[in-house]
Amino acid sequence: MVMTVRVIAPDKTVWDAPAEEVILPSTTGQLGILSNHAPLLTALETGVMRVRQEREWVAIALMGGFAEVENNEVTVLVNAAERGDTIDLETAKREFSEAQAAVAKAAQSGSKQAQIQAAQAFRRARARLQAAGGVVEI
């Protein structure tokens, strides 16, 4: 049994296809969705959503949002999203390294605003790198 999965950002539909399984980065941890899942509405963290079609997994970097599950339909509304197969791995690695350095610099600055912004940029860079297939070492 399959379900319909849609990932919608303000500027585009990132994914609209059937799938057998979905793993979402919810605010309470990873959340697995299979066919006939109970109705659900959940907030999503910045992270990687994984969609399984037959034996293939597709990774999608999500930048926060919400997911609704109902009647074998999973609708994900996000601020921004990118399929992992469209992200350049080398660029993602470089951005992740830069984000790590920015977190360290912000911690030394003592500015709460700088720390929050650096942490958000770090989460985005980590999600993009993971979706692109990179190994994240912290």
Swiss-Prot record:
Bilayer topology term: Peripheral membrane protein
Cellular component GO terms held in the UniProt record: plasma membrane-derived thylakoid membrane; proton-transporting ATP synthase complex
Disulfide bonds: none
InterPro entries: ATP_synth_F1_dsu/esu, ATP_synth_F1_dsu/esu_N, ATP_synth_F1_esu_C, ATPsynth_dsu/esu_N
Subcellular localization, as worded in the UniProt entry: Cellular thylakoid membrane
Signal peptide as annotated in the record: none
Domain of life according to the entry: Bacteria
Keywords from the named record: ATP synthesis, CF(1), Hydrogen ion transport, Ion transport, Membrane, Thylakoid, Transport
Alphabetized GO MF terms: ATP binding; proton-transporting ATP synthase activity, rotational mechanism
Primary location class: membrane
Subunit organization: F-type ATPases have 2 components, CF(1) - the catalytic core - and CF(0) - the membrane proton channel. CF(1) has five subunits: alpha(3), beta(3), gamma(1), delta(1), epsilon(1). CF(0) has three main subunits: a, b and c.
Family classification: Belongs to the ATPase epsilon chain family.
Summary of the function given for this chain in its UniProt record: Produces ATP from ADP in the presence of a proton gradient across the membrane.
NCBIfam families per UniProt: ATP_synt_epsi, PRK13442.1
Protein name: ATP synthase epsilon chain
